[in-house]
Swiss-Prot record:
Keywords: Host cell membrane, Host membrane, Host-virus interaction, Lipoprotein, Membrane, Myristate, Viral immunoevasion, Virulence
Pfam families named among the record's database cross-references: F-protein
Compartment(s) where it occurs, according to its Swiss-Prot or TrEMBL record: Host cell membrane
Membrane topology type: Lipid-anchor
Organismal lineage: Viruses, Riboviria, Pararnavirae, Artverviricota, Revtraviricetes
Entry GO terms, CC: host cell plasma membrane; membrane
Protein name, UniProt field: Protein Nef
Leftover remarks: This is an African green monkey isolate.
Primary role: Seems to play a role in optimizing the host cell environment for viral replication without causing cell death by apoptosis. Enhances virus infectivity and pathogenicity. Probably involved in viral immune evasion mechanisms.
Annotated lipid attachment (N-myristoyl glycine): G2
Entry-linked InterPro entries: HIV-1_Nef_core_sf, HIV_Nef
């Protein structure tokens, strides 16, 4: 039997996985479900816990606290709202090199980010997950300006933003183009370069130090 901490971690992972893939066509490539390889019991328990545990301590969009028996799904009618526990589960800390490397490889091993289209909403989801599950203060996620590949400003974070071409389906299907998350994303530097970006894992980012890029990373992230 798994411990309560293990079950809580699975719930957090599933929340992140579903949040990042909240709309059809989120993936640039097909990624694995974070619960693949887990026992069917754990998968079933995580599924049941989603409706129960996520509602505890939550507020509805109109400011009403969820009561016992309510589910967050009943009130989560705004796709742009991102819901997580009110308070972080662990002590707060700033991002460090070691923490960035560990966090990157954790995300990579769980299939939570690699190959996902970038959008402002997904960036917020990742920040909230890092804050609530890892205690990482959300001043860390920033990237070099475009056009082209955007490199992380935090030394040790192994995910960069890479421009990609849309799938043939996305280019030719009018309905798919209108609804595709790639069409609704925004450049992280706030400039429209007409590029579609995806997160890509690059372990070399943990060893290739470029002082000009990583200088004053926290100050840059706050701007």
């Amino acid at each position: 039997m798994g411990s309560s901490n293990s079950k809580r971690q699975q719930q957090g992972l599933l929340k992140l996985w579903r949040g990042l893939r909240g709309k059809p066509g989120a993936d640039w490539v097909l990624l694995s479900d974070p619960l693949i390889g887990q026992s069917s019991t754990v998968q079933e328990e995580c599924g049941k816990a989603l409706k129960k545990s996520w509602g505890k301590g939550k507020m509805t969009p109109d400011g009403r606290r969820l009561q016992e028996g309510d589910t967050f799904d009943e009130w989560d009618d705004d796709e742009e709202e991102v819901g997580f526990p009110v308070q972080p589960r662990v002590p707060l800390r700033q991002m460090t090199y070691k923490l960035a490397v560990d966090f990157s490889h954790f995300l990579k091993s769980k299939g939570g980010l690699d190959g996902i289209y970038y959008s402002e909403r997904r960036e917020k989801i990742l920040n909230l997950y890092a804050l609530n599950e890892w205690g990482i203060i959300d001043d860390w996620q920033a990237y070099s300006p475009g056009p082209g590949i955007r490199y992380p400003r935090v030394f040790g974070f192994c995910f960069k933003l890479v421009p990609v071409d849309l799938h043939e389906e996305a280019r030719n299907c009018e309905r798919h183009c209108l609804m595709h998350p790639a069409q609704m994303g925004e450049d992280p530097d706030g400039i429209d370069h007409g590029e579609v970006l995806v997160w890509k894992f690059d372990p070399k980012l943990a060893v290739e130090y470029r002082p000009d890029m990583f200088k004053d990373m926290h100050e840059h992230a706050k701007r």
